[in-house]
């Protein structure tokens, strides 16, 4: 298994090291290539992502990312557009996958959260994030700024189909989240596509929520959800709320996936680089470890993905609110898997 590893910035290298430790506890065939990508490289020489980097990344089975970002040192948007989004578009990571699960001992801000266990399938290469927009008469009182939400039948259908396929392995329920009553063109395309693809999956029940209603239900009744499918912007917002109701983004893993398998998919914890605690050895690597489990599942190793997830669940339950150092958590989970 050839992995490209981008430790990145802040706590990224620390949590990624623990994820690799756990991966090696279940797989003896892990070959790693480290990549110096992120704010450190940009601040050192102004480079973000070269053609040579892309060519090399494509030679791997998957990519494991730690965190990217240096708030206050790099202007907003530079790393996001020049590195993360560039990689997403070039490697066709059209499925952004975000599982949300409330562990028994995790603290939810909800009084009665119920049994929360759902995934959000977010479209990753279209919508408002595709870079279709611009400004006119900038700096004047007549300035005009526009961002165009681009939605194609091809792009929408492949993500919707992915959501239905995932639902078949879960509780067989898909909820489309959009704003079809206002965004009638894009929303209409999404709704028609869901209706048509649903005919191929008669065992899967289908529901629809407006995005504003979905934010309410995610707080009042999150257990209603199994698989949510939505566009780029709505998915970005909704998944952060999902992280909050399940105990915070410290346990939130994600995958940026090319479902066709033509390019290596990338897996990462949702949290940022957290430069304020970098180097202190107190960052929680759990989300990075769960991202490694997602990576294995994507590559077809369901058995070891489940083993890691079960070991994480046991460790989270045992630790409760007790604080542990980054390496201690990785050591415990790796030891449990090696026993």
Curated annotation (Swiss-Prot):
Reaction equation(s) it catalyzes: (2R,3S)-3-isopropylmalate + NAD(+) = 4-methyl-2-oxopentanoate + CO2 + NADH
Pathway given in the UniProt record: Amino-acid biosynthesis; L-leucine biosynthesis; L-leucine from 3-methyl-2-oxobutanoate: step 3/4
Required co-factors: Mg(2+); Mn(2+)
GO cellular component: cytoplasm
Site residues, Important for catalysis: 129, 179
Gene3D superfamilies referenced in this protein's UniProt entry, alphabetically: Isopropylmalate Dehydrogenase (3.40.718.10)
Matches recorded under SUPFAM superfamilies: Isocitrate/Isopropylmalate dehydrogenase-like (SSF53659)
Complex formation: Homodimer.
Family: Belongs to the isocitrate and isopropylmalate dehydrogenases family. LeuB type 2 subfamily.
Protein name: 3-isopropylmalate dehydrogenase
Species of origin: Corynebacterium aurimucosum (strain ATCC 700975 / DSM 44827 / CIP 107346 / CN-1) (Corynebacterium nigricans)
Lineage start: Bacteria, Bacillati, Actinomycetota, Actinomycetes, Mycobacteriales
